[in-house]
């Protein structure tokens, strides 16, 4: 029976470990997906296989065992990414979990002492399987009492420290006149936002979990007003901090006008973001209502890539520093359509400032608080595989988040191209569908997305006519496939996607968008066009890829106005 696993030999090393850092047994069975090595620093106890790991983000160890036909085998041991219920346990007390194999049962445990995950105290019976005999952990007499007193003392010290820090922070805020703390710093200083007396609310155009978006007027200009309730002040501060970064102005990023406080009529006053209003609505709304020709589709795709490349770029310009920014919530609801039918990226509530090489020390971003903060993301449908299975590279998290954005960008490019009439022999695209809607429906669960995108490595379907409608039979397919590759390191950068789309939009240095791609041969499946696609970059190392969507009306005239939308 697998009990102690021969790993208690690691315990003497605990005396050499910092008392502020939990040390756990580390083990991963061959073939296990999703390594937890990045959650701590490896500690070798000797030349043999047993290893320890010193936790970086929690004080909690875990263990996973697989019980099959009465035989237990260890699957994983290591550090958890955060302290959670169960971590206060002194010993590893396994809890049964479901297993895809009916003849097997997984047991997991969490505990909060050094090397507590080296063995389990017992495995409770599951179904008709026999459980191993109880094994009492070898504990020093009086150990639990001593540990309880130690934990109580640590709790009192932390409580006193928190009270002192809160008082000092409150005093500092008063001295500074209510200055706003850094986003995510945990500060709760009250601040006096300006009252926007000239702001007029007209109608609600979108409601979300953290805010309500209104159409309104400010000093005679039509604007979008993102109104946050008092409980969502942290979300307000985080989004405002990104919009107020110097050098963030760009045609394809939603324009920030001002921030303040106020409210419509009798409703309580709260923090507000005032943004430019985009009457044509979101990309999702637009694609649902209209089809587009080749030139309009390229305009939307290229402007979207330009906006994301700008967000990701770290640069100095005119004496102003702009850090790299990961969006983390790209979706067709969070992209808005401008009057010229180009795109503007909005909803920066989850955006994260990235560490940079040229960053002034005063502008260095606050390190996210552990993996949970880094892995936080927006709309599940557009989440990259490494976010769905939580294998994102936490050592180089800035680059990893940019690669996850490019995956989301690929799904948006697929949605745009799915409504391009020139990519269909009959010029009649099907009704608009979101990415993966054809495979999983309109409201897929995280488990369904994981099974399709991670386990099966499926992506939205790319119709064969897309290859035939362009003179390069591989151009669009390559672009999309290189953006949503299962290997994050193999994906294009946003700048590279921009270059590839620019070559499609301006073939041979043309000054305007092409009206349509070269026509499709009669038999698209057997006779793809063989000519060299003039839109394909001839000297770029970048690659590209795309997929399918819905339909109804033909392209709208530029002056046509549809229901007002704004990102939230």
Swiss-Prot record:
Topology within the bilayer:
Single-pass type I membrane protein
Kindly indicate where the leader peptide sits in this chain: 1-15
For binding ATP, which residues are annotated in this chain's numbering? 205-213, 226
Q: Which residues form the active site?
A: 329
| Spans traversing the lipid bilayer | 148-168
* Highest taxon, organism lineage: Eukaryota
Q: A Pfam family this protein belongs to?
A: PK_Tyr_Ser-Thr
Catalysed reaction(s)? L-threonyl-[receptor-protein] + ATP = O-phospho-L-threonyl-[receptor-protein] + ADP + H(+); L-seryl-[receptor-protein] + ATP = O-phospho-L-seryl-[receptor-protein] + ADP + H(+)
- Enzyme superclass (EC): transferase
In this protein, the residues bearing a glycan are 66, 119
Could you state a single Gene Ontology molecular function term?
protein homodimerization activity
* A GO cellular component annotation in the UniProt record: plasma membrane
What ranges does the Extracellular topological domain annotation cover? 16-147
Q: What is its EC number?
A: 2.7.11.30
Q: Could you tell me the keywords of this UniProt record?
A: ATP-binding, Disulfide bond, Glycoprotein, Kinase, Magnesium, Manganese, Membrane, Metal-binding, Nucleotide-binding, Receptor, Serine/threonine-protein kinase, Signal, Transferase, Transmembrane, Transmembrane helix
Which segments does the topology annotation call Cytoplasmic?
169-568
Instruction: Name the protein family.
Output: Belongs to the protein kinase superfamily. TKL Ser/Thr protein kinase family. TGFB receptor subfamily.
Its biological purpose: On ligand binding, forms a receptor complex consisting of two type II and two type I transmembrane serine/threonine kinases. Type II receptors phosphorylate and activate type I receptors which autophosphorylate, then bind and activate SMAD transcriptional regulators. Receptor for anti-Muellerian hormone.
Its recorded name reads: Anti-Muellerian hormone type-2 receptor
Species, as recorded: Mus musculus (Mouse)
List the taxonomic lineage. Eukaryota, Metazoa, Chordata, Craniata, Vertebrata
């Amino acid at each position: 029976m697998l009990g102690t696993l021969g790993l208690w030999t690691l315990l003497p090393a605990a005396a050499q470990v910092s008392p502020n850092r939990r040390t756990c047994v580390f083990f991963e069975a061959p073939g296990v997906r999703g390594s937890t090595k990045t959650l701590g620093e490896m500690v070798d106890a000797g030349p043999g296989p047993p290893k320890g790991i010193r936790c970086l983000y929690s004080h909690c160890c875990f263990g996973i065992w697989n019980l099959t036909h009465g035989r237990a085998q260890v699957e994983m041991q290591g550090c958890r990414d955060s302290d959670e219920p169960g971590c206060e346990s002194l010993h590893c007390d396994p809890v049964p979990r479901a297993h895809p194999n009916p003849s097997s049962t997984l047991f997991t445990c969490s505990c909060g002492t050094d090397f507590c995950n080296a063995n389990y105290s017992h495995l409770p019976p599951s179904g008709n399987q026999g459980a191993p005999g109880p094994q009492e952990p070898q504990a020093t007499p009086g150990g639990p009492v001593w540990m309880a007193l130690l934990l109580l003392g640590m709790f009192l010290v932390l409580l006193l420290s928190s009270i002192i820090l809160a008082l000092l922070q409150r005093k500092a805020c008063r001295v500074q006149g209510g200055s706003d703390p850094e986003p995510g710093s945990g500060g709760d200083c009250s601040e006096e936002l300006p009252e926007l007396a000239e702001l007029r609310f007209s109608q609600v155009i979108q409601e979300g979990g953290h805010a309500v978006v209104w159409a309104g007027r400010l000093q005679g200009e039509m604007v979008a007003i993102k109104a946050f309730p008092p409980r969502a002040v942290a979300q307000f501060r985080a989004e405002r901090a990104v919009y107020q970064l110097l050098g963030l102005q760009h045609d394809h990023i939603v324009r920030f006008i001002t921030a303040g406080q106020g409210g419509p009529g009798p409703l309580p006053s709260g923090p507000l973001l005032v943004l430019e209003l985009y009457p044509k609505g979101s990309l999702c709304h637009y694609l649902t209502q209209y089809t587009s020709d080749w030139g309009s589709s390229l305009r939307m795709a290229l402007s979207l890539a330009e906006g994301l490349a700008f967000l990701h770029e770290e640069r100095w310009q005119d004496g102003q520093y702009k850090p790299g920014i990961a969006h983390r919530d790209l979706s067709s609801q969070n992209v808005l359509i401008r009057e010229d039918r180009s795109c503007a990226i909005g909803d920066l509530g989850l955006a994260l400032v990235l560490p940079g090489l040229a960053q002034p020390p005063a502008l260095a971003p606050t390190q996210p608080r552990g993996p949970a903060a880094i892995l936080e993301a927006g709309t599940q449908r557009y989440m990259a595989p490494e976010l769905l299975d939580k294998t994102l590279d936490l050592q180089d998290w800035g680059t990893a988040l940019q690669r996850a954005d490019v995956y989301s960008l690929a799904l948006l490019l697929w949605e745009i191209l799915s409504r391009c009439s020139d990519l269909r022999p009959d010029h009649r695209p099907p009704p608009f569908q979101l990415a993966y809607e054809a495979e999983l429906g309109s409201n897929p669960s995280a488990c369904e997305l994981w099974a399709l995108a991670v386990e099966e490595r499926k992506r939205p379907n790319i119709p064969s006519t897309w290859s035939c409608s362009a003179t390069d039979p591989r151009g669009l397919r390559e672009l999309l496939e290189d953006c949503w590759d299962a290997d994050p390191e193999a994906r294009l950068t946003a700048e590279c996607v921009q270059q590839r789309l620019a070559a499609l939009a301006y073939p041979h240095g043309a000054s305007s968008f092409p009206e349509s791609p070269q026509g499709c041969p009669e038999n698209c499946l057997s006779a793809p066009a063989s000519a060299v696609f003039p839109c394909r970059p001839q000297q770029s190392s970048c690659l590209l890829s795309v997929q399918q969507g819905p339909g109804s009306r033909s392209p709208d005239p530029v002056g046509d106005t549809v229901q007002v939308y704004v990102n939230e």
